[in-house]
Amino acid sequence: DMKFVDVKNDVAFRKIFGNENKKVILISFLNAVLGLEGQNRVKEVTLLNPFQLPRLAGEKSSIIDVRATDEQGVTFIVEMQVAEPAGFDKRVLYYTSKDYAGQINSGDDYPLLRPVYFIGILNFDYFRGEDYLSSHSIIDEATGENGFKDLKFRFIELKKFNKKTHELKSIVDKWTFFIKYAEDLEIMPENIDDEGLKEAYEEAAQHNWTREAYDAYIYS
């Protein structure tokens, strides 16, 4: 009998996805949500803000939940938003462009700039579309051509995701199910064959949490 923490919780989310010792979790998640395959797959990540237990109960230790770069120098920002903050859209653009501009010091170095991808997991409805997963990029409004490929945004809207265990088809379905429903489960679903997702369930199992970490989770 396994009980899982609420993955949407601030401490839980960062402990699972920002875990220095379990990078396979973040790597699998990024590849799934961004649909990266073959040569484009993320193979290794460097966490720019690895998870640390808050020093004080209820303290938020970082503004952004997870920031990482891969071996190609691409930056990934992953955020779990339980409630819609004021100026949400501007906040997303602010952190994405800050990470983009922050890569170089002088204007001569433009060719060195590497892409920044933002993944937002939202526990509220934000976009008009019905699909729980949406992709946003800078496009030519007439032709749909994506001329500025370095900034990409993916959003998972949990309220629009209502699939049951037997309906989980894609790996993104399975990750979204984990984030939304893990706390309600007694055991890991049967059809989980992805190494990173298996590790994520293990990491979310309450019996793998120290007293100190669990206290931080409860009080966050």
Model-derived regions: residue spans:
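Elongated, amphipathic alpha-helical interaction scaffolds
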Residues: 1-220
